[in-house]
Amino acid sequence: MRIGLFTDTYFPQVSGVATSIRTLKTQLEKMGHSVFIFTTTDRDVDRYEDWQIVRIPSVPFFAFKDRRVAYRGFSKALEIAKQYKLDIIHTQTEFSLGLLGIAIARELKIPVVHTYHTQYEDYVRYIAKGMVIRPSMVKYIVRGFMSDLDGVICPSEIVYDLLLKYKVAAEKRVIPTGIELEKFQRPEITEEDVSDLRAKLGISSDETMLLSLSRVSYEKNIQAVMAALPSVLEEEDKVRLVVAGDGPYLPDLKSQAKKLGIEDKVVFTGMIAPGETALYYKAADFFISASTSETQGLTYLEALASGTPIIAHGNLYLDNVITDQMFGTLYYHDNDLAGAI
């Protein structure tokens, strides 16, 4: 088949959605399909770098400056879609490219399916401080977007149950997003490599390294991990938290570390190169996440594939992943986080 993936976010933007789309593209191509990505322009990449990636003129989304939305070039996108003779369109966003994908599918009279990635109730706070779109309005917006789809892919049971609650009528199926295991197993990474990274981070061999790796934003709830750290340090002083990643909430976390008096126990690395991700996982004793906004959470799978157990806020998805203590520890209330660590 000739498949068009429509998304507002793709590399070089870093996100779980971008990663899942690249994985999907790679695996579909291995099966013999032709895959074309329709996405937004990005100042860090040549618009015409790859003929299979169609970049539509875009501007930063006012509520998420590191995310973009298309604003013109729609007729050109339709023309290109006709030239590529698409058999099916798979949308990955509810915004500009998602709406464009549905419109093009109807114009070409081909099926359109959609993957629902995001619990928007956790994100509407970014739009005019939650004064324009309230959490209670999300279900109506999503239901309207999905009213004319041929099918919806749910990455987890969490999403499936959420769409049932929204009363989305379209046919739904749970299809988890996989990861490319070889990118994280990495047998060529040696103990010396791990020791060198820990030394670079200022973490000794007898210290426990907790790794948080994600976009640094409010909904990732890294602040809960920071808040739990003083209680942990009262019981065990040799614990260090590494916050790997960048994002709008980074200054707040640095300020929080200072207020809590744990600046010497927290390492902020900023953005790390994708090729170093597995090394960071392997250098850590535990991957930690207090996020309650994940619909699936690829970083959990990446950590486990790297051989690193996780400490995370439990949910329906993780309850089916962490089935043995060797894989990690789940907790269900923020006041239980310190005990879980």
Language-model features: locations:
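Short hydrophobic beta-strand element within catalytic cores of glycosyltransferases
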Residues: P309-A312
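Conserved acidic donor-binding segment of nucleotide-sugar-dependent glycosyltransferases
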Residues: D324-N335
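N-terminal subdomain of nucleotide-sugar transferases
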Residues: M1-R55, A81
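Donor nucleotide-sugar binding/catalytic pocket of nucleotide-sugar-dependent glycosyltransferases
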Residues: T39, V54-P57, P135, Y140-D193
